[in-house]
């Protein structure tokens, strides 16, 4: 499946916010906080149109979860045909992806790294190997790191970093002794720390 594999700090500068695409080990905040988006500097900054604002919010969310347009559109279509608030359901569907849960549990420092672990079959769901990053988890599902990969320095370092920095969302429970975690509830809007206005994205797609 196609993926963006280019520089991620440039993406975050374009969106103007930290999308948690870069590990804290290697994140150069000086680069991120350079004034303005990447590219040649411009003398004037024109007023952003309503469409421009909607587009930027969509791009932020797509890029945070590492999705291309077709994938993202499919999530939106599913959310729009579900009962409830479309924007919140969209976020919930994205949060329930396996790559995101591996990241949220602290076994990976970025969603991109989590996708790599999953693609190499280092992750188990309910005792079975799963190599699909978009695999959707349900309440009661158990995620584990494969036994042969548990000794990796990546995992030990990531767990230490996670415990000291981000913490685990309350809809998940982590068991670091056994290199696993459980989905204990469905994520709600207040659990999701991304600086995105999901209703603006709904307005863009509903035109």
Curated annotation (Swiss-Prot):
InterPro entries linked to this entry: Ribosomal_uS4, Ribosomal_uS4_bac-type, Ribosomal_uS4_CS, Ribosomal_uS4_N, S4_RNA-bd, S4_RNA-bd_sf
S4 RNA-binding domain sequence ranges: 96-159
Record key words, sorted: Ribonucleoprotein, Ribosomal protein, RNA-binding, rRNA-binding
Superkingdom, taxonomy of origin: Bacteria
Disulfide partners: none
Any one annotated GO CC term: small ribosomal subunit
Signal peptide: none
CDD domains recorded: S4 (cd00165)
Sample GO molecular function, one term: structural constituent of ribosome
A Gene Ontology biological process term: ribosomal small subunit biogenesis
Summary of subunit composition and partner proteins: Part of the 30S ribosomal subunit. Contacts protein S5. The interaction surface between S4 and S5 is involved in control of translational fidelity.
Described function: One of the primary rRNA binding proteins, it binds directly to 16S rRNA where it nucleates assembly of the body of the 30S subunit.
Family affiliation: Belongs to the universal ribosomal protein uS4 family.
Protein's name in the database: Small ribosomal subunit protein uS4
Organism: Leptospira borgpetersenii serovar Hardjo-bovis (strain JB197)
């Amino acid at each position: 499946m196609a993926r963006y594999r280019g520089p991620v700090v440039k993406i975050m500068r374009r969106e103007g916010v930290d999308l948690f695409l870069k590990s804290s080990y290697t994140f150069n905040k000086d680069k991120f906080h350079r004034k303005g988006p990447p590219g040649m500097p411009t003398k004037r900054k024109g007023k952003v149109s309503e469409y421009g604002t909607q587009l930027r919010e969509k791009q932020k969310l797509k890029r945070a979860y590492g999705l291309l347009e077709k994938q993202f559109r499919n999530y939106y279509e599913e959310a729009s045909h579900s009962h409830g608030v479309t924007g919140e359901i969209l976020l919930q569907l994205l949060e329930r992806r396996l790559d995101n849960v591996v990241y949220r549990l602290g076994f990976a420092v970025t969603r991109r790294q989590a996708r790599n672990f999953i693609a190499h079959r280092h992750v188990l769901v309910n005792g079975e190997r799963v190599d699909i990053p978009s695999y959707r988890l349900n309440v009661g599902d158990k995620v584990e790191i494969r036994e042969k990969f548990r000794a990796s320095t990546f995992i030990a370092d990531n767990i230490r970093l996670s415990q000291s920095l981000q913490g685990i969302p309350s809809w998940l429970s982590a068991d670091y002794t056994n290199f696993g975690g459980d989905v204990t509830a469905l994520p709600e809007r207040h659990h999701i720390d991304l600086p995105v206005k999901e209703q603006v994205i709904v307005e863009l797609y509903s035109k």
